[in-house]
Every structure is written in C-alpha cells, then in structure tokens.
UniProtKB/Swiss-Prot annotation:
It comes from the Bacteria. This is Glycerol-3-phosphate acyltransferase. Keywords: Cell inner membrane, Cell membrane, Lipid biosynthesis, Lipid metabolism, Membrane, Phospholipid biosynthesis, Phospholipid metabolism, Transferase, Transmembrane, Transmembrane helix. PANTHER family: GLYCEROL-3-PHOSPHATE ACYLTRANSFERASE-RELATED, INNER MEMBRANE PROTEIN YGIH. NCBIfam families: glycerol-3-phosphate 1-O-acyltransferase PlsY.
C-alpha cells in the first residue's frame, strides 16, 4: 500500500471512529432520552449530565475522548510502516474531529468536540493533553461554565503545542480543530455574553 493510499485509509478510518456518538449510544443503552432532544440539544457529556445521570455522562465523556485517542494512536502506530509523516497524521487529526462534529452514523448531527479533542491531544502528546486538560479544569472550577472552559482551552492548545514542538503540520491541525470547536460554540458564546449560559451540573429535564 502506497503512502498516499495509506494516508487516505487512515483518514477515512479516523472519520468513522470519530463518527460514533457515545452520547447517543450510551443514552440508548441506558434507556435515557436522546440528548439531542433536551437541554442544549448537543450530544455531548455536559448535556447528558443535565439528564441527572452522572454515570451516563461519565461514560459519554470517556467514550468520546477514547475514540479521539484511538483514531490518532492507531495512525501513529501504523504510520512508519507506510511512510506516513506528520502531514498525514495531521489529516487524521482533522478527520477524527470532523467525524465527531458530522457523524455519518447519526445523520451528520454531532457534538461540539471537547472530549474528542482532548483524546486527540493526549494521543499526540501526554504533556500537551495534560496542559490543555489542566486549563479546562481551572476555568471550569472557578467559573462553572463548561463552554467557557472549552473555549479557553481551545485557544491555548495550539500555543501549548508550538511551545513544546514548534510549528509543523500538527500545529496547523490543532489550530484548525480549535477554530472548528470555537465555531461549534457560537450559541454558547452568545449565551455567555447574555448571562444565560447553563452552569456545570444544572439539570434540564428531558421534554
């Protein structure tokens, strides 16, 4: 298999892995309402938490992070065998993230990508992932807004990468991922500015 074909295969596989929406899968398995029908309507861990089921929210968080990590880890593992370099891995990063945002298995209606991005960053570098997660935790602890924590973390993640490894294709992929994540939070940004954003742990009962 040529390098180009391998890169395409890795990217398609990453997209398909990213397309598994654990918010929907876990909610169905546990007999809960579809997270796209209540709260923010976002199929993600924070919205699942609004159902009042912490176990489901934790499983969603872990699943979405794990798929991001798995997609990139597998590509990195196999890349040397087929001569796939950083540019190819960068495409895998973007493909996995797009899979979560626009999942083929769920009518292209996906989440905002916070947990999946965290998994991807951890796969690229443990230090990068931990620095970004620490940023999220600090903002979330002090302000109690998951969306604000995600936005701040998204802004800092590319800079953390550049500080650790310099500017390369992966830095560009992380920047693209951050822009996409911020774009998915447009409604949250508007609510934050209006003082109407829901805080972490607030329950919005399914309708």
């Amino acid at each position: 298999m040529s390098t180009v074909v391998a890169t395409v295969v890795f990217a398609v596989a990453a997209y398909l892995i990213g397309s598994v929406s654990f918010a929907v899968v876990v909610s169905r398995a546990m007999g809960l309402a579809d997270p796209r029908t209540y709260g923010s309507g976002n199929p993600g861990a924070t919205n699942v938490l609004r159902s009042g089921n912490k176990k489901a929210a934790i499983l969603t968080l872990l699943g979405d992070a794990a798929k991001g990590w798995l997609a990139v880890w597998l590509a990195q593992l196999l890349a040397p065998r087929y001569g796939v370099e950083d540019m190819g891995i960068a495409l895998v990063v973007i493909a996995a993230f797009l899979g979560h945002l626009y999942p083929v298995f769920h009518r292209f209606t996906g989440g905002k990508g916070v947990a999946t991005a965290a998994g991807i960053l951890l796969a690229l570098s443990g230090w990068l992932g931990l620095a970004t997660l620490a940023t999220w935790l600090i903002i979330a602890t002090f302000f109690r807004y998951s969306s604000l924590a995600a936005l701040v973390s998204a802004v800092f993640a590319p800079f953390y990468y550049v500080l650790l490894f310099g500017i390369d294709p992966l830095a560009g992929a992380i920047a693209v991922m951050s822009v996409l994540l911020i774009a998915r939070h447009r409604a949250n940004i508007a609510k934050l500015l209006a003082g109407k954003e829901s805080r972490i742990g607030e329950k919005k009962k399914p309708t």
